[in-house]
Curated annotation (Swiss-Prot):
Protein name according to UniProt: Methylenetetrahydrofolate--tRNA-(uracil-5-)-methyltransferase TrmFO
Native organism: Myxococcus xanthus (strain DK1622)
PANTHER family from the UniProt entry: GLUCOSE INHIBITED DIVISION PROTEIN A, METHYLENETETRAHYDROFOLATE--TRNA-(URACIL-5-)-METHYLTRANSFERASE TRMFO
Cofactor(s) demanded: FAD
Top-level taxonomic group: Bacteria
This protein's record includes keyword Cell inner membrane: no
SUPFAM superfamilies: FAD/NAD(P)-binding domain
Lineage: Bacteria, Pseudomonadati, Myxococcota, Myxococcia, Myxococcales
């Protein structure tokens, strides 16, 4: 019988929870996987299987010279359950990794049911276990009862709506138009990039935002916006000048080309410490991704050649302020036996959630065996994702928002390169550094973790 103190409870049978449970069990750690289905479902879920894909059957690009494709490759090298199931149930989709979703979920469910040391327990969790390690991987639609329980542990740093502004590659911003300056010279004096607009440019932009195609929310996503974080199109509908007195206000700024205060500005804030990516401040939006690219590139001066590393969006999401709450191993600073994995920690996307679950499994296994958790290098996709969750990829006090993997959160490259060359360089560097790190994950070249039996510990 396993020592109950060494038995890990994983709450949530999505991509993060299933990957975490599988990787722990492969390393000899006994796991109880708690999933509320089939007794109860969130408004988004329809099936009784684990790892249900809700919004899309695509795991996005499989090109290893894209950030997400690089993450796919790293997870394959690590022996990921999710990537193995995806590859086995792939459907034609160009260079995207798309899956037959029912077979994909069934494959993961069957793998875990067959896995020694994994006990699957159905039913809603309303209170966290009082003893032993616990991994919370309940996703963006965490049940109301468990949400109330989590609030007892994390306080006010639990958020319920996800408002994401677009992120741009620094190399794609026209620096002949943009100028560095903070309002009234505050902070460092030049912490922001500013894209100035004339009166005519501003009103043309507003007209396009109001007319642009918007994403229709899911039935379970009743729009309830915070006044301090409204979508730009909602502000524009309140009046043509609302944005000019809000996030686009020009006060305290002077365009060095004219010496005058612009009529309006789009401000960009540094997204990573290397300054390779910039966030469009206050530009959370429900415009479709195609409309965002069209409107922002065509009607904001300086963005005509813009490369979008992340698109803006707003949707229902439950997540914690991980950089302030979690230690470097993704455990809660105030209660180290509690770990957070997946979207609730602030990653966005199926594959990113699985990767986060894998990282938690490594960190927890290290703690249980009394060994050091060696995080993946910041030059790898796995390492970049971890640094996003812990806040290391961003400037101090940067507001935590869920994010997909992008090259903007990687350790930056040096020197100027063309876009294709830069992506190839990121990929080559990551591949080399991951190979050197794999032994720290207990993974030989074949991608199967070396077995350490924790059940007898």
């Amino acid at each position: 019988m396993a020592d109950q103190k060494q038995r890990v409870t994983v709450i949530g049978g999505g991509l993060a929870g299933t990957e975490c449970a599988y990787q722990l069990s492969r390393r000899g750690v006994p796991v109880v996987l708690r999933e509320m289905k089939p007794q109860k479902r969130s408004p988004a879920h329809k099936s009784d299987t684990l790892a249900e894909l809700v919004c899309s059957n695509s795991l996005r690009s499989d090109n290893p010279e894209s950030a997400i494709g690089l993450l796919h490759a790293e997870l394959r090298a690590l022996g990921s359950l999710v990537l193995s199931a995806a590859d086995a149930n792939r459907v034609p989709a160009g260079d995207a990794l798309a899956v037959e979703r029912e077979r994909f979920s069934a494959a993961i469910t069957e793998s875990l049911l067959r896995q020694p040391g994994v006990e699957l327990v159905a039913g809603e969790v309303e209170q966290l276990p009082e003893d032993g390690p616990v991994v919370i991987a309940t996703g963006p639609l965490t049940s109301d009862a468990l949400t109330r329980e989590l609030e007892r542990h994390v306080g006010t740093r639990l958020y319920f709506y996800d408002s994401i502004a677009p992120i741009l590659s620094a190399d794609s911003i026209d620096m002949n138009v943009a100028f560095r300056q903070s309002r009234y010279g505050k902070g460092g004096g030049d912490d922001y990039l500013n894209l100035p607009m004339t009166k005519d440019e501003y009103y043309r932009f507003i007209a396009e935002v109001k007319a642009g195609q918007k994403v229709v929310p899911h039935a379970f996503e009743e729009p309830k916006y915070f006044e301090g974080c409204l979508p730009i199109e909602v502000m524009a509908e309140r009046g043509d000048d609302t944005l000019a007195y809000g996030p686009m206000k020009p006060v305290g700024l002077r365009d060095p080309r004219t010496g005058q205060e612009p009529y309006a500005v789009v401000q960009l804030r540094m997204e990573d410490v290397g300054g390779t990516s910039w966030n469009m401040v206050g530009f959370q939006t429900r415009l479709t991704w195609g409309e965002q690219k069209r409107i922002f590139s065509s009607f904001i001066p300086g963005l005509q050649q813009a490369e979008f590393l992340r698109m803006g969006q707003i949707h229902r999401n439950t997540f914690i302020d991980s950089p302030r709450l979690l230690a470097k191993d993704l455990s809660l600073k105030t209660e180290p036996r509690l770990y957070f994995a997946g979207q609730i920690s602030g990653v966005e996307g199926y594959v990113e959630s699985a990767a986060c679950g894998y990282l938690v499994a490594l960190a927890l296994h290290a703690r249980l065996t009394g060994t050091e958790f060696v995080p993946p290098p910041a030059t790898t996709a796995m390492g970049a994702l971890l640094r996003h969750v812990t806040g290391e990829a961003h400037p101090p006090d940067y507001p935590h928002q869920p994010s997909n993997i992008s090259f903007g959160i990687f350790s930056p490259l040096t020197g100027r390169m063309k876009k294709a060359e830069k992506r190839a360089a990121y990929s080559a560097r990551a591949k080399q550094d991951l190979a050197a790190w794999l032994p720290h994950a207990g993974v030989p070249a074949a991608g199967a973790p070396e077995h350490v039996d924790q059940r007898s510990a």
